[in-house]
Amino acid sequence: MEEGSSTARAVVRSTCGFTVGLSLATAFGLLELLGEGHSPFGCLVTTVTLAAFLSLGMGFSRQVRVSVLLLLPQAFSKQSRLLLLVASFGLVLQGPCANTLQNFTRASEAVACGAELALNQTAEMLERAKQPLISALSKIKAIAQKAKVVGDRIRKFFRSIIDAVKHIARCLQNVWYWLLHIGDMCNSELGNPYSKCTQVFDDAKIHCMKVVSGFPHLCYALLPYKLLVCGLASLVQKFCVLPSYLEFFLRTVIRTPVMKLLGKLRREFEFNMTATHYFSVDLNSSRSLSQVALDLQEAVSMKLYTAREALSLMGYTMPLLIGFLYIQALCYRYYYLNSDKFDNVYITRRFLDMEAVRSLAGMPTVLPLSSHEAKHYIQPDSMFLSQREQMFYTLEIFNLTRHLLIMLLLVFLDYGVFWLLDLARYHLQGEIVARSPVVVSISVEGSGYSGNIYRDLASAFDVMQQGNVSVLSPRCTLHPSEPDAKGYIVIGTMYGLCFFVTLFGSYVSRLRRAICASYYPSREQERITYLYNMLLSHRTNITATVQRAVRRRSADQGQMNILQVLAIRLPFLRPLLGPFSLQQSYCMGCGEPEDKGGMENFVSCSTPGCRGLYCPTCFRLLNNTCSVCSAPLSNQGHLDLELDSSDEESPQLWLAAARRKAPEQELKLRQQLQEALGTNLSDKSTSKPERAGNRNQDRKQ
């Protein structure tokens, strides 16, 4: 019967685990598909793989079941909160930030389109501005062509005249050459008659002198004949000189005037016609303005490639989060099973049962906890947080607030950019065309080449005035990208989940211990025993520490601090030093001031003349015994009775406490004190401590 019930429980447990595993895998797949926006095929593969692991693991493996159950409260841990914030910020980067970048991209494209449109219209205006000059240039070219035809005809006519003149010149040149060479031919044929004649007589004279060398004077008789005969021969020489005189006459009278006349005739037909046209427009550009803008966008995209890849990884934060949380759950299970100190700060029901058993058996107990212990050890169902949890709670709230401010700033930036661009789109929609307000017409009258040129120029300027310039065109209309309202809802949900995890994470994280305790009860009992023994040993050490603190403060109580000395020495400073509570009382064990706990919560020693004042916790740790006056009677410590002979107050307090607590020990204590001090202690001196004690009681009341 018992075996059948255990088998039924195992079957139910496996069935529930299998169902829970399938449900968790299905929820994860829907979150990936609808929340993260992944591809359906990838979500299907991931969901099927995760469902196989979770369903089979939770159905048939105790370890997997514990790890998955630990995964749920582990989602409220510090690391999971951090990953949730990272995932939420990833949604912000993929939503508002990406939309802001998209709006800036569309704005830059619209600006580039407008700039290219303006450039094209500028080129069109330049073409229109060139039309008058081109028309004038065509007329000038036509005039030049006609002038060239006339010039060709004049050139032919002039060439005919030049040919005729050249023919006449060649005839005259032949005559000229004949006259020029006729003298040379005459001289070459006839020679120089006078020279030849004188040469003959000179040769005869020389020959005569050779023949009649004895009578050379006879040879001089030929001289008169020489002069006569050679003078007649010089008349023949005049005939050869006539051509040279005729050549000079022809050069000066005929050749020079004829050449001047021909040059003057040529200059009459010479003319220059120059047409100069200067029109230079430099618009050298290898790429259009839109191509330049696209190149700039491509360069910026290359620079931001690493950042875009990092942003793309934000879409896989959910699988990374689940994997990290599962590893954290495995680590928690491992440390729970192997470390007694790990997360062992809870006063559970089993701890209280152990406390009750020890109390009934008369053994030392640890409850109630001290104020210091209560800050570190709490009950699992308590609404109060431990000191460590409070510190982490404050830090997480501050961190979440910082992330919320950054998220709101990015969301407002996205909406602000869209609002500005949409406002610009609303006011710049339509088409604006700039037209000439006044059309001026110019009429040119007259005929001829100049009139035609001026008339063409005027008509070209009429064409320019009729042109229109598009200032705003629908082709460059700005279309900003609207913010995704659904994305805002998802982001708000994620940050709301982060806030919920931060607010209740410390409470939900306590369920991890409960889950492990339900699956490992023997291990939980070991941890509770360790915690109880640690508190008990710590409590014993605390008692000795409190006793030493009481003795130290009792010895220092008669001394005054610097503020008290100043108040006594300088009375006018007392109003200023009054707020510092110069006469403030405090617990002699832990030093807690009376204004924190209230004087009604403090316990004063009932021994007359004793200044002992304790908080309830310290008084309970001292077993409701004053360590100032009852120290020699305590079983927990032994005082060193090394007293000065002038110290009479402490022995009297000890004797009074012994008389009140154990009268039979008074005589024994008196003997020990007399041996230590070397003097006799009489009962007369007790009146002074009693009066001092009464005054002390009156002051405390």
Curated annotation (Swiss-Prot):
Traits of the deletion mutant: Knockout males are completely sterile despite normal mating behavior with ejaculation and vaginal plug formation. DCST1 and DCST2 double knockout males, but not females, are completely infertile. Mutants have no disturbances in sperm migration into the oviduct, acrosome reaction and zona penetration. Mutant spermatozoa are capable of binding to the plasma membranes of oocytes but fail to proceed to membrane fusion with oocytes.
GO-annotated biological processes: fusion of sperm to egg plasma membrane involved in single fertilization; sperm-egg recognition
InterPro entries: CSR-E3_Ligase_Protein (IPR051856), DC_STAMP-like (IPR012858)
Basic and acidic residues biased stretches: 685-701
Superkingdom of source: Eukaryota
Cited Pfam families: DC_STAMP
Tissue: Expressed in testis.
Segments for region (Disordered): 673-701
Cellular component annotations (GO), alphabetically ordered: acrosomal membrane
Annotated coiled-coil segments of the chain: none
Localization terms from the record: Cytoplasmic vesicle, Secretory vesicle, Acrosome membrane
PANTHER family: DC-STAMP DOMAIN-CONTAINING PROTEIN 2 (PTHR21041:SF6), DENDRITIC CELL-SPECIFIC TRANSMEMBRANE PROTEIN (PTHR21041)
Function (record text): Essential sperm cell-surface protein required for sperm-egg fusion and fertilization.
Protein name (record): DC-STAMP domain-containing protein 2
UniProt source species: Mus musculus
